[in-house]
Amino acid sequence: MLDTTTSTALKQRLLIIEDEGEMCLLINLLLDDEDLEIEHVKSLSAAVEYFQQQAPSLVLMDNRLPDGYGIDFISFIKHKYPGTKVVMMSGMDAAAKDVALENGADLFLEKPFSRSQLCRAIHLVTGWHREA
């Protein structure tokens, strides 16, 4: 049965596309105080399946994934789900950052990043602010 409680209904959905389990766990821990419904997939093919079921409000995506590059997946998201915000995260060079932004990423977050940098990035692209 679908949970229709007010707190669940108001939560924004974040999809993390990241193949490294430790990084995903770290992101979950960093965002523990945020009022987000967080889902995680490890590949682009799993992300496509996820999008067929529901569109998240925000995607936090690594670039190097087992079945392709996140940079190439941005255009799929932006074309089919224009309301979904995309934050690319990677330890790549400045040229890759430029390509990610040119492909439609709303923001590029360079690894490693702090909790405040991650939360600021989410708030900047979505306008979400945690209720006190």
PLM region descriptions:
Residues 43, 69-72:
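Acidic catalytic/metal-coordinating carboxylates
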Residues 21-39:
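Two-component/phosphorelay signaling modules centered on CheY-like receiver
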Residues 49, 71-81:
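Short amphipathic alpha-helix used as the core "switch/output" element in two-component signaling
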Residues 40-58:
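Acidic, metal-coordinating helix/loop segments flanking the phosphotransfer/catalytic sites
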Residues 62:
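Active-site residues of response regulator receiver
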Residues 72, 92-109:
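Alpha4 helix (beta4-alpha4-beta5 surface) of REC/receiver domains from two-component response regulators
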